[in-house]
């Protein structure tokens, strides 16, 4: 399948704004109205007198939760970022009537930078409990006494900072577009990205790349930024962000589509956006009629400048990012990318990351033999007196084993390339594993001129959350003596890198010694395939020559165990996808990386044939088989491959009764086949646990390893759930490794599912290279 359609200008058919003093885009009648937004700055509430930061923050205390279908129980769990983004999207969509024919193809893409107030509250609750437990243990208190006093403290802590089963959903960046999709009744693809102050630009480029295909016909692009505390600001100042600019909170939504769609629907076009580009060095300075912006809006920077461009009736806007390089958005299209000759994208190399060493041979042996990485919590990983209880309780966990990395402390991870201690101790452990996993790719990636690095990750890493505790610690409820604040490294140049998902991509680019477009993606447990989707679309459009893409997350941290336990999502023993009595998943640390290119590669491992997605957010937590089936249908519509020739499906397979049933039901709509050629199904989560943002990448690595060994590994759960409608497909779950025979056309073909909270679904079809 080929597509010679070039990237076309975007039609902006509506805008929505929620900024200080501005509740609607229509309130910005003149450029004077815009200038008022940032000219009345004052020192931010948490700013130090010795280092004042001027800005304007948002007050959304009057947010209408009922309008956006948020139950009273969950209201404290919903982040400020989510509330602002919902208001901006509502403003943008208010004047548009979306026909039913566009709802399946209306994407919801968002941009943020660093963490949310919800994430910071959750981290502070867990951090305070661990600190109190360690204090009592150091005083020689018996274990039973420590548990009792911790349990007594959990109630006032929950009353102070909030505590509900929705806490994990509320802190997830991907909940923002999922909630917008729920409000707007759209079912297109869904994700949140972090491109730092180029986040808006990445959203626009993603929309351009997506509109070349019929599975995307319009998009609601929303960028949002809040500034929560002093350590967050100081990390940004260390990166060169101006202390003198007005730091501006808020959210902006742009509704964009191809010009043809705007004309078909009779929508007025506010402006076109043609060239949407970045440059890494040797860039010209802004001309006199385009001076540098007088405000810093974080993830909202590009969209703020586009609003200003429209109000000033200028033909372009531009800026310099604190991450390096310049960006520019032109109304006219003066540049054109050359699309890839073939839509198929080659996989050049891959590297799985699990709780085992970085060894592909051991990875395959674990898969083939049906083994796992299950281990007991260590005292360093989980403070049992603080958190582990025999039954489900508030701010606790009820599981004793996970599939974790051997170490969660950066100091305990040996690097393949030396690093300064002042840098290493400020990075996240996932970043160190990522650097080690891609260590051998330096020469290979340097062969390509235009490169991107896209990381599926939690967008707010542990360092960001731990620094936030400094700001919230004084507000902790009283206890028996002050709770000591955990020691943290002072903030320096490397603190920002270790705090955010985009920092992982930036570190890899520096490690390879290359200039690359970098950003991070979060789409709940579908994050990795969402990142692969972005990479594939960009390669197909001719935007890059190669992309390193993957995902990684430490899903076994104390805060994740506590938050997931509150949702009753975890298995009391171990994950058993599709089994009788499946009771949840086991968290695992890991993920994987792949190197992709659209150029002909003589030794490609496999080719990605098609990828697409959907978001059916009728429920923020319950899976929906029709929404999952829509993602599969859209993917298969982009390839000439007959679904009946796909031999193996790597399932999302979370091992929950509801999730397993929903997934199997979704498969019968597209993968129904002759009873003599069953679809084989498996899940890497049995072997390595659920790696959250890294899950889809690990699934992809499993399929690639199976291609290489020409065998389908087992998911040995022993007793399958007889109530699953496997026979309707028909499908089988191998209990031991079986040969992966060539199909009648001499090929091996597979598909991969990745589903996430909020109804976010992605599906990929892959073929082994000849």
Swiss-Prot record:
EC nos: 2.3.1.-
Domain remark in the UniProt entry: It seems that PigJ is composed by an active ketosynthase (KS) domain and by a chain length factor (CLF) partner domain that potentially decarboxylates the malonyl group of PigH.
Pfam family, one: Ketoacyl-synt_C
Family annotation (SUPFAM superfamilies): Thiolase-like (SSF53901)
Similarity comment text for this entry: Belongs to the thiolase-like superfamily. Beta-ketoacyl-ACP synthases family.
Disulfide bonds: none
InterPro entries in the cross-refs: Ketoacyl_synth_C, Ketoacyl_synth_N, PKS_Beta-ketoAc_synthase_dom, PKS_NRPS_Biosynth_Enz, Thiolase-like
Biological process annotations from GO: antibiotic biosynthetic process; fatty acid biosynthetic process
PANTHER family for this protein: FATTY ACID SYNTHASE (PTHR43775), INACTIVE PHENOLPHTHIOCEROL SYNTHESIS POLYKETIDE SYNTHASE TYPE I PKS1-RELATED (PTHR43775:SF51)
Phenotype reported upon loss of the gene: Cells lacking this gene show a white phenotype and produce 2-methyl-3-n-amyl-pyrrole (MAP).
Protein residues bound to substrate: 652, 690
Protein name (database record): Beta-ketoacyl synthase PigJ
SMART domains: PKS_KS
Cross-referenced CDD domains: PKS (cd00833)
GO molecular function, a single term: fatty acid synthase activity
Ketosynthase family 3 (KS3) domain span: 342-768
Keyword annotations: Acyltransferase, Antibiotic biosynthesis, Transferase
Residues the record marks as active site: 525 (for beta-ketoacyl synthase activity), 652 (for beta-ketoacyl synthase activity), 690 (for beta-ketoacyl synthase activity)
Pathway the protein acts in: Antibiotic biosynthesis; prodigiosin biosynthesis
Gene it is expressed from: pigJ
Role noted for this protein: Involved in the biosynthesis of 4-methoxy-2,2'-bipyrrole-5-carbaldehyde (MBC), one of the terminal products involved in the biosynthesis of the red antibiotic prodigiosin (Pig). Catalyzes the decarboxylation on the malonyl group attached to PigH to yield a C2 carbanion of acetyl-S-PigH. Then, the heterocyclic pyrrole group of PigG moves to the PigJ active site Cys-525 to generate a transient pyrrolyl-S-cysteinyl PigJ intermediate (acyl donor) whose pyrrolyl group is captured by the C2 carbanion of acetyl-S-PigH to yield the pyrrolyl-beta-ketoacyl-S-PigH.
């Amino acid at each position: 399948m080929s597509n010679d359609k070039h990237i076309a200008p975007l039609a902006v058919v509506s805008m929505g704004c929620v900024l200080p003093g501005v509740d609607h885009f229509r309130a910005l009648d003149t450029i004077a109205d815009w200038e008022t937004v940032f000219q009345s700055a004052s020192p931010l509430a948490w700013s130090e007198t010795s280092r004042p930061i001027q800005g304007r923050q948002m007050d959304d205390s009057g947010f209408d939760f009922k309008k956006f279908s948020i139950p009273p129980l969950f209201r404290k769990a919903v982040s400020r970022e989510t509330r602002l983004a919902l208001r901006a999207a509502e403003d943008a969509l208010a004047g548009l009537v979306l026909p039913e024919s566009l709802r399946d193809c209306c994407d919801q893409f968002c941009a943020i930078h660093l963490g949310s107030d919800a994430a910071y509250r959750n981290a502070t609750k867990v951090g305070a409990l661990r600190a109190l437990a360690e204090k009592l243990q150091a005083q020689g208190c018996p274990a039973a006494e420590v548990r009792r006093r911790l349990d007594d403290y959990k109630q006032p802590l929950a009353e102070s900072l909030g505590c509900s089963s929705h806490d994990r959903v509320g802190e997830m960046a991907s909940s923002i577009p999922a909630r917008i999709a729920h409000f707007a009744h759209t079912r297109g693809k869904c994700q949140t990205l972090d491109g730092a102050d180029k986040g808006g630009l990445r959203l626009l480029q993603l929309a351009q790349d997506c509109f070349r295909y019929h599975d995307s016909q319009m998009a609601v692009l929303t960028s949002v930024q809040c500034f929560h505390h002093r350590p967050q600001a100081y990390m940004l100042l260390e990166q060169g962000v101006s202390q003198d600019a007005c730091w501006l909170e808020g959210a902006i939504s742009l509704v964009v589509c191809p010009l043809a769609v705007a004309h078909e629907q009779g929508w007025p076009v506010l402006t076109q956006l043609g060239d949407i580009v970045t440059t890494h060095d040797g860039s010209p300075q802004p001309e006199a009629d385009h001076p540098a912006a007088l405000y810093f809006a974080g993830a909202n920077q590009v969209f703020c400048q586009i609003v200003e461009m429209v109000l000033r009736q200028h033909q372009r806007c531009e800026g310099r990012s604190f991450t390096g390089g310049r960006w520019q958005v032109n109304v006219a299209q003066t540049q054109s990318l050359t699309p890839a000759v073939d839509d198929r994208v080659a996989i050049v190399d891959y590297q799985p990351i699990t709780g085992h060493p970085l060894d592909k041979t051991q990875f395959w042996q674990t898969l083939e033999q049906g083994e796992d990485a299950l281990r007991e919590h260590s005292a360093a990983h989980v403070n049992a007196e603080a958190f582990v209880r025999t039954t489900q309780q508030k701010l606790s966990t009820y599981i004793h084993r996970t599939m974790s990395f051997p170490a969660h402390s950066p100091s305990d991870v040996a690097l393949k390339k030396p690093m300064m201690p002042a840098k290493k101790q400020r990075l996240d452990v996932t970043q160190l594993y990522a650097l080690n996993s891609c260590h051998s790719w330096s020469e290979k990636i340097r062969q390509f001129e235009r490169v991107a690095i896209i990381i599926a990750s939690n967008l707010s890493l542990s360092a960001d959350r731990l620094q936030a505790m400094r700001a919230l610690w004084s507000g902790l409820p009283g206890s028996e003596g002050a709770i000591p604040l955990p020691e943290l490294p002072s903030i320096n140049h490397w603190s920002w890198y270790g705090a955010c998902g985009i920092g992982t991509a930036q570190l890899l680019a520096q490690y390879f010694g290359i200039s690359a477009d970098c950003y991070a993606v979060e789409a709940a447990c579908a994050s990795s395939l969402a990142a692969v989707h972005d990479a594939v679309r960009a390669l197909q459009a001719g935007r890059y020559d190669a992309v390193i893409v993957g995902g990684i997350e430490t899903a076994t941290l104390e805060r994740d165990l506590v938050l997931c336990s509150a949702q009753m999502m975890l298995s009391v023993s171990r994950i058993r996808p599709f089994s009788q009595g499946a009771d949840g998943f086991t968290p695992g640390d890991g993920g994987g990386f792949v190197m992709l290119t659209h150029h002909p590669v003589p030794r490609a491992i496999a080719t990605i044939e098609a990828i697409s997605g959907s978001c059916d957010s009728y429920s923020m937590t319950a899976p929906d088989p029709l929404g999952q089936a829509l993602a599969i249908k859209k993917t298969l519509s982009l390839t000439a491959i007959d679904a009946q020739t796909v031999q193996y499906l790597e399932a999302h397979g979370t091992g929950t009764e509801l999730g397993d049933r929903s997934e199997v039901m979704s498969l019968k709509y597209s993968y129904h086949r002759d009873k003599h050629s069953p679809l084989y199904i498996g899940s890497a989560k049995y072997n390595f646990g659920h790696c959250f943002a890294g899950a889809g990448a690990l699934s992809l690595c499993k399929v690639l390893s199976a291609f290489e060994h020409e065998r389908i590994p087992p998911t040995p759960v022993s007793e399958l759930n007889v109530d699953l409608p496997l026979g309707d497909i028909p499908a089988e779950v191998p209990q031991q490794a079986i040969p992966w025979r060539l199909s009648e056309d001499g090929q091996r073909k597979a598909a991969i599912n990745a589903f996430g909270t909020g109804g976010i679904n992605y599906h990929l079809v892959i073929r082994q290279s000849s």
